[in-house]
Amino acid sequence: MITVDVDLGDRAYPIHIGSGLLSKAELFAPHIRGARAVIVTNETVAPLYAAKVEEAIRSLGKAVDTVVLPDGESFKKWDTLNRIFDALLTAGADRKTTLIALGGGVIGDMTGFAAACYMRGVPFIQVPTTLLSQVDSSVGGKTGINHPLGKNMIGAFHQPQAVLADIDTLRTLPARELAAGMAEVIKHGAIADADYFAWIEQNIRGLNDCDTDLMTEAVRGSVRIKAAVVAQDERETGLRATLNFGHTFGHAIEAGLGYGEWLHGEAVGCGMVMAADLSHRLGFIDIDTRNRITALTCAADLPTVAPALGVDRFIELMRVDKKAEAGEIKFVLLRKLGQAFVTTVPDADLRATLLHAVLRPPTEAPVA
């Protein structure tokens, strides 16, 4: 087992990475201080893993309840969140009750938000079961739900007590879900570590096949980068915003198509291709770097051509973004591979990238 620590002073917490973690009661024990835990999971994950976690918690002498929610991004909303609150109140959960998020990013985000809100804050543990949630969304304390007008617009920062990333759970992922998680792995290399990006390029075939050793290293490499960023900028006032590389375009794709039509990682993958094109168009990266990002995204079985939402609709959707200020859209771009920054961009260049992303094969030279 590998452990990466998120250094937030008295709110620091461990990220444990390895195989067979769901059954290890000793990993849960330090973080469940009350008499009860409530597992929040979904209809897909519950039959696979809920019993293992329940058994581990009961072996500690704790009561455990399990809330099973519908599966999918389209359920990341108020109605579903209220089902968690209903279950907590019905079970008599108190301020020492620990919530356990057992599932992917949707479950993690909603469980964390419920933990932030219930009785003004209760502890929770992240047990991510998808690649995307293991390498990204389970780390850093961002929680929330979607609104019809924008993704993740309602939420809170609420750090977990611990993250248990069991690599074994990735073996049951559909290929499409595994690919979606690779988008965030690629993102971390692109924004923070060119050597890590090159390692992903060299090992993409084995990663696509979910090789255990390679996947363990990918999760470790990504959470190492994210943990370092979160430790420096927990509330996303500066550096942490660079973790949104590809997300401004990606969130617009998700909202424009309807949540759930594309997986989040698929939209981020395409968004990274678009952000790389915009970075090149503005003179920050060369054509080879842009094409490396596009080629690796494609090799990870992610979409590289954007849906035809229309340029004006894309721009309208991107204005509803947490990074936007006074209606001005901000983008995470690359100065070079491994170095990202946040900026505004000229409207003409943005429109050119949007047209290019839909109409041109992504490896062609940009349209002037």
Curated annotation (Swiss-Prot):
- UniProtKB keywords: Amino-acid biosynthesis, Aromatic amino acid biosynthesis, Cobalt, Cytoplasm, Lyase, Metal-binding, NAD, Nucleotide-binding, Zinc
Which pathway does the record list?
Metabolic intermediate biosynthesis; chorismate biosynthesis; chorismate from D-erythrose 4-phosphate and phosphoenolpyruvate: step 2/7
Stored InterPro entries: Dehydroquinate_synthase (IPR050071), DHQ_synth_AroB (IPR016037), DHQ_synth_fam (IPR030963), DHQS/DOIS_N (IPR030960), DHQS_C (IPR056179)
Q: What class of enzyme is it?
A: lyase
Q: Give the catalysed reaction(s), semicolon-separated.
A: 7-phospho-2-dehydro-3-deoxy-D-arabino-heptonate = 3-dehydroquinate + phosphate
CDD domains listed in its UniProt record:
DHQS
Q: Which Gene3D superfamilies match?
A: 3.40.50.1970, Dehydroquinate synthase-like - alpha domain
> Which residues does NAD(+) bind?
71-76, 105-109, 129-130, 142, 151, 169-172
Top-rank taxon, per record: Bacteria
Free-text remark on how the cofactor is bound: Binds 1 divalent metal cation per subunit. Can use either Co(2+) or Zn(2+).
Q: Name one process (GO BP) from the record.
A: chorismate biosynthetic process
Q: Where does Zn(2+) bind?
A: 184, 247, 264
The EC designation for this entry is: 4.2.3.4
Q: Where in the cell is it found?
A: Cytoplasm
**Family indicated by similarity:** Belongs to the sugar phosphate cyclases superfamily. Dehydroquinate synthase family.
Classification via NCBIfam families: aroB (TIGR01357)
**UniProt name for this protein:** 3-dehydroquinate synthase
The organism's lineage? Answer: Bacteria, Pseudomonadati, Pseudomonadota, Betaproteobacteria, Burkholderiales
